[in-house]
């Protein structure tokens, strides 16, 4: 039960609230609101659970065709139906597992990739400005300036993953780039 101490109230650190079982305590109010916004975007049928149809619709919206097998594998990662609390628990598990950080980054970018392993620049720019910590137009442009974009407006996912994960603690890999 290791909790990150970057929460809003460090004075309550010594107090245990229910043995740390409240996943909402692991995130700031802003983070919870952003997760909720993302959940609501994904819960297309508004039944409070992200199912296969919801995932398919989300992938379709970002221009990524996902196979039934891919969708089934994503849903199988959850130990129970994915309601909002389960989604938060899944993010919390990922956040506390430091060795998974690079894998999480890779999976996030691969979710946007087409069959050739590329991301459409315009689709990615739109996602940066729409979801999570929304980028401004200038911030999105700055981020895209750091990426190799081919003449067709495509970004190589593996190049982005390597760029982002190389500095994650392996100084030799960071110097190599």
UniProtKB/Swiss-Prot annotation:
Q: State the tissue distribution.
A: Expressed in tail muscle (at protein level).
Q: What keywords appear on the UniProt entry?
A: Allergen, Calcium, Metal-binding, Motor protein, Muscle protein, Myosin, Repeat
Name the domain of life: Eukaryota
Q: Which SUPFAM superfamilies match?
A: EF-hand (SSF47473)
- Domain EF-hand intervals: 30-65, 135-170
Residue ranges for the region (Disordered) are 1-24
Residues binding Ca(2+), per UniProt: 43, 45, 47, 54
Q: Which residues cross the membrane?
A: none
Q: Where is this region: IgE-binding epitope?
A: 13-30, 22-48, 49-66, 58-90, 79-99, 118-141
Composition bias of kind Basic residues appears in: 1-16
What do we know about how this protein assembles, alone or with others? Myosin is a hexamer of 2 heavy chains and 4 light chains.
- Protein name, per record: Myosin regulatory light chain 2
